From Swiss-Prot:
Record's compositionally biased regions (Basic and acidic residues): 429-452
Region (H-S-H (helix-span-helix), dimerization): 280-410
Name of the encoding gene: TFAP2D
Annotated source species: Homo sapiens
Protein name: Transcription factor AP-2-delta
Function: Sequence-specific DNA-binding protein that interacts with inducible viral and cellular enhancer elements to regulate transcription of selected genes. AP-2 factors bind to the consensus sequence 5'-GCCNNNGGC-3' and activate genes involved in a large spectrum of important biological functions including proper eye, face, body wall, limb and neural tube development. They also suppress a number of genes including MCAM/MUC18, C/EBP alpha and MYC.
Assembly and binders: Binds DNA as a dimer. Can form homodimers or heterodimers with other AP-2 family members.
Length: 452
């Protein structure tokens, strides 16, 4: 009997409230009933053990229905022929009510089960469709599986397992309540910038929210600065082209190595809707820029541009290159080549200045065509935002060198023309001087003749 009604015997033996004799008398009646129905003891609904293949998965199609008819028919006939088995006859405590309701859910009426299962399957299909459109189906399927592993069996949400059932005189949880609970746990909405945000209950996760603060790798001890890492930046590190694993991501975020460090990081990312599977392999080659967060990479690019502008010897380099070709025949051709190079360099700079790759917490609207913008975005993601500003700084320095070359050539040409004009003028003055001397001598000779 203890194997057939474990919950009832345990409850009758441990309760000492003055009514043990009455309950034991009822249990005696139940024992006779159990002996007469020993053929059904192996399949009794109170001792039925579920297997992993007999409950409805939320990823089955909506037309898949599960109805354990042999258990339902026996449970229905047994309760109606023996009313002492009903929960009201024993007035069991709340824990026993929850156990009986769980058994009623397992062997309930087919219509309630089908409605709950259809609602769950319909909601799952809708969520899968949204996730495919957003490109993040894998990131959220782990969360759905975790819901199933924590008791969301038979199409039921875990929060609804211990709710009172229809046999206790209360309304059962409907499909609307089930859908609302699923939406509260793993709903997807879009923010104003078009990013994916995860809604869990009343908490809304925005891609621009702060994930953590990371100390800089390149700063000295006297000027250590921290850089903010947003959820969107972490998502970019987990997405192509890098697809970093837990070890590399933990190194970027400066997390100390621990026994459960990777698992804790994956759980935190999973709560935010980001998928980081265990044993993942990186997709891109690791460089020194891989270890930098985007804030520090931008800081490095700004310092590089400032150093190029203030410390690079652009004038000395430009004059040195211009002196290599100072022949009169080459000067005109060199000027034309320098002007053409400056024009091409300016066009390149204008193109890079229109790059709208996502960086930090910003996701600007693209200006360029998507065919060229996706390549610039790939380069920006690989360099963590350092590449494009660094190239712009180098191009600006190159423009300064070309300008110095052009100024030196123009100055040298003007100096030569001025020297030639001065030499011609001096030669004319030297020819006029002897004529003036001869005329003065002739005048003096005429004066002497007159005196004579």
């Amino acid at each position: 009997m203890s194997t057939t009604f474990p919950g009832l015997v345990h409850d009758a033996e441990i309760r000492h409230d003055g009514s043990n004799s009455y309950r034991l008398m009822q249990l005696g009646c139940l024992e006779s009933v159990a002996n007469s129905t020993v053929a059904y003891s192996s399949s009794s609904p109170l001792t039925y053990s579920t297997t992993g293949t007999e409950f409805a998965s939320p990823y089955f199609s909506t037309n898949h229905q599960y109805t354990p008819l042999h258990h339902q028919s026996f449970h229905y006939e047994f309760q109606h022929s023996h009313p002492a088995v009903t929960p009201d006859a024993y007035s069991l405590n709340s824990l026993h009510h929850s156990q009986q309701y769980y058994q009623q859910i397992h062997h309930g009426e087919p219509t309630d089960f089908i409605n709950l299962h259809n609602a769950r399957a319909l909601k799952s299909s809708c969520l899968d469709e949204q996730r495919r459109e957003l490109g993040c189906l894998d990131a959220y399927r782990r969360h759905d599986l975790s819901l199933m592993s924590h008791g969301s069996q038979y199409g039921m949400h875990p929060d609804q397992r211990l709710l009172p059932g229809p046999s206790l005189g209360l309304a059962a949880a409907g499909a609307d309540d089930l859908q609302g609970s699923v939406e509260a746990q793993c709903g997807l909405v879009l923010n104003g910038q078009g990013g994916v945000i995860r809604r869990g209950g009343t908490c809304v996760v925005n891609p621009t929210d702060l994930f953590c603060s990371v100390p800089g790798r390149l700063s000295l001890l006297s000027s250590t600065s921290k850089y903010k890492v947003t959820i969107a930046e972490v998502k970019r590190r987990l997405s192509p082209p890098e697809c970093l694993n837990a070890s590399l991501l933990g190194g970027i975020l400066r997390r100390a190595k621990s026994k459960n460090g990777g698992r804790c990081l994956r759980e935190k990312l999973d709560r935010l809707g980001l998928n980081l599977p265990a044993g993942r392999r990186k997709a891109a080659n690791v460089t020194l820029l891989t270890s930098l967060v985007e804030g520090e990479a931008l800081h490095l690019a700004r310092d590089f541009g400032y150093t190029c502008e203030t410390e690079f010897p652009a004038k000395a380099v430009g004059e040195h290159l211009a002196r290599q070709h100072m022949e009169q025949k080459e000067q005109t051709a060199r000027k034309k080549m320098i002007l053409a190079t400056k024009q091409i360099c300016k066009e390149f700079q204008d193109l890079l200045s229109q790059d709208r790759s996502p960086l930090g917490s910003s996701r600007p609207t693209p200006i360029l065509d998507l065919d060229i913008q996706r390549h610039l975005t790939h380069f920006s993601l690989i360099t963590h935002g350092f590449g494009t500003p660094a190239i712009c700084a180098a191009l600006s320095t190159f423009q300064t060198v070309l300008s110095e070359m052009l100024n030196y050539l123009e100055k040298h040409t003007t100096h030569k023309n001025g020297g030639a004009a001065d030499s011609g003028q001096g030669h004319a003055n030297s020819e006029k001087a002897p004529l003036r001397k001869t005329s003065e001598a002739a005048v003096k000779e005429g004066k002497t003749e007159k005196t004579d």
